[in-house]
Regions:
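Extracellular glycan-modifying ectodomains
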Residues: 1-208
Length: 208
């Protein structure tokens, strides 16, 4: 990210990476997880700005109102067409999308949830990819910025939010279903919310 620091990597009014920031994070993360996969290029994507006047949670919290609005961009993979099934589990309820970017949520005032439907206890992305590997991710909202890119290189990617995980969602998980496990947290979450011990307890139980 440092090498691309002059680009639009972070929102001005939201405490998260932009889609472009997520892409650059993926360019480093992807090759480490996936041997033999070609280095990603922006030319592999059709980029669309779906909202150009977004003011996020940081803007709402501060009395300073001179910040410029943010733009929300989606990256559609065009190198090889993909179909997606996104399944979200939360409080015993099940919701599905057939897209990585459910844009109808813009009309509901849930702008940041257009990225994989937002953060839920368990989010699973299934892709008709030629790659057969599966990935289990323990992460926070930062992971939502790069999952749309990683999803194209796996058959299944599951994101688990340890802080929303209930007993019903927990029962749907099995380490045996995945080839790799990734921990993807912002520094703030990792340092202030006792994430390692939560993850360790869950992994120990799942292995039993």
């Amino acid at each position: 990210l440092f090498n691309a620091r002059d680009q639009y990597l972070y929102y001005r009014t939201e405490d998260n990476l932009t889609s472009l920031g997520g892409f650059y994070l993926y360019t480093v993360l992807g090759p480490k997880l996936l041997e033999g996969v070609a280095r990603p290029s922006l030319s592999d994507y059709d980029i669309a700005f779906v909202k150009t006047d977004y003011y996020g949670s940081l803007y709402q919290k501060t009395p300073y109102k001179e910040a410029r609005a943010d733009s929300l961009a989606i990256f559609q993979y065009t190198k090889t067409p993909r179909q997606y099934l996104v399944t979200k589990r939360q409080d015993g309820a099940l919701k599905t999308y057939h897209t990585l970017y459910p844009l109808h949520l813009l009309d509901l005032g849930r702008e940041m949830d257009i990225f994989v439907g937002g953060l839920s206890a368990v989010t699973t992305i299934q892709t008709n990819s030629p790659y057969k590997a599966s990935l289990l991710v323990f992460g926070d909202k930062t992971a939502l910025t790069f999952l749309p890119f990683l999803a194209n290189q796996y058959s299944t990617v599951t994101l688990v939010d340890l802080f929303q995980l209930g007993s019903q969602e927990y029962e749907s998980l099995s380490l045996l279903d995945y080839d790799q496990v990734l921990f993807a947290y912002s520094i703030e979450t990792f340092m202030h919310y006792n994430t390692p011990s939560r993850a360790n307890r869950l992994l120990t139980t799942l292995e039993e």
